[in-house]
Amino acid sequence: MSLYIGLMSGTSMDGIDAALLELPSNQLIHGITKQYSDDVRRNLDDLIIGNHLTLASICQLNTLIGREFAEAVRQLLIEIKVHPKEIQAIGSHGQTVCHDTSGNIPYTLQLGCGHTISSLTGITVVADFRTRDLVNGGQGAPFAPLYHQQIFSKVNESVAVVNIGGIANVTFIAKNQMTRGWDIGPGNCLMDAWIYKNKGALFDKNGVWASQGEVIHPLLEYLLQDPFFHLDSPKSIGKEYFSLSWLQKHLKPDYTPADIQATLLALTAHTIAETILNESGEIKQLYLCGGGAHNTHLKESLARLLPGITVKSIAELGISPDYLEAMMFAWLAAQTINQIPVNLASITGAKGIAILGAVYPIIKSY
């Protein structure tokens, strides 16, 4: 038995998920979510939403986020009463602040200094997972399909898994076939940004506000024309693309805020449903994970758009929808520490197999 910790803060920026994973069983021992401090959250909003990309702010945030990730580890270990020396390594995704693979020089940046996390926790850290994939010709994301493949390794039917974080991504798994996956488009990011702007809430719990509005169909059709939705897979996208500024270019003064929220939920539902339906009717089971798995109105919308397909939370399999991505980075850290390469060719388009991440080691004294 080996213990690894995974750390994840997604494009929703709603906090740091920390998961203690037992391998090789892939059993979640314990998980916590630590909210960002007000200062860090405000600085992230300024950086990503306001595009205040100063060199000083990036460097400072890199250290500050590293400290907060380390604090999440400390809280996790205190709650579960495990000593840092019992942990083989931490896998840290970091906080994505920019990601764009559309140009001649693709780039990605995740903040959360690996040296800081390692020094403050006394545990070896693996971080910066996306860069190697970009260098190898991949999209740098999503990685979730790799771990979904582990969970459904004994699948006897074709299934789809959709992770609805800030950005939604899909995994298609079928017996005796290569696992495939890519980013679909906005998951929660636009809905979260719109309700925060209008009501000061971090998210629309259960989609209640969206359910009170009416879908603006001309707006929905216009949003669906965005070029990203028509790109071939593999593809990836960042929250900075599907931002409030992207949305506001398409709004008219007579649109009500609740109707816009309803339309944004419909955008997420339609893009997910279209992705699933394009699989030629092979998919009969759709599992949801991420924060969007708790949005009952979104789940109901997907069920209406996908007749004949069972839509359920991955929680029904006994797997936490909230900590699945953190678990994945614990698993990825184990692959890196043990020099086990992964194959992302059918997911990100990367050429060949690779060992992902950079290692920030700690010398353990026993």
Curated annotation (Swiss-Prot):
GO molecular function, one term: phosphotransferase activity, alcohol group as acceptor
UniProt record, GO biological process: 1,6-anhydro-N-acetyl-beta-muramic acid catabolic process; amino sugar metabolic process; peptidoglycan turnover
Catalytic activity: 1,6-anhydro-N-acetyl-beta-muramate + ATP + H2O = N-acetyl-D-muramate 6-phosphate + ADP + H(+)
Organism, scientific name: Legionella pneumophila (strain Paris)
Binding residue positions for ATP: 10-17
Enzyme Commission number(s) from the entry: 2.7.1.170
Matches recorded under HAMAP family: AnhMurNAc_kinase
Descriptive protein name: Anhydro-N-acetylmuramic acid kinase
PANTHER family xref list: ANHYDRO-N-ACETYLMURAMIC ACID KINASE
Function of the molecule: Catalyzes the specific phosphorylation of 1,6-anhydro-N-acetylmuramic acid (anhMurNAc) with the simultaneous cleavage of the 1,6-anhydro ring, generating MurNAc-6-P. Is required for the utilization of anhMurNAc either imported from the medium or derived from its own cell wall murein, and thus plays a role in cell wall recycling.
Enzyme class: transferase
Family: Belongs to the anhydro-N-acetylmuramic acid kinase family.
Pathway info: Amino-sugar metabolism; 1,6-anhydro-N-acetylmuramate degradation; Cell wall biogenesis; peptidoglycan recycling
Source superkingdom: Bacteria
Coiled-coil positions: none
Keyword line: ATP-binding, Carbohydrate metabolism, Kinase, Nucleotide-binding, Transferase
InterPro entries, per database record: Anhydro_N_Ac-Mur_kinase (IPR005338), ATPase_NBD (IPR043129)
Gene3D superfamilies assigned: 3.30.420.40
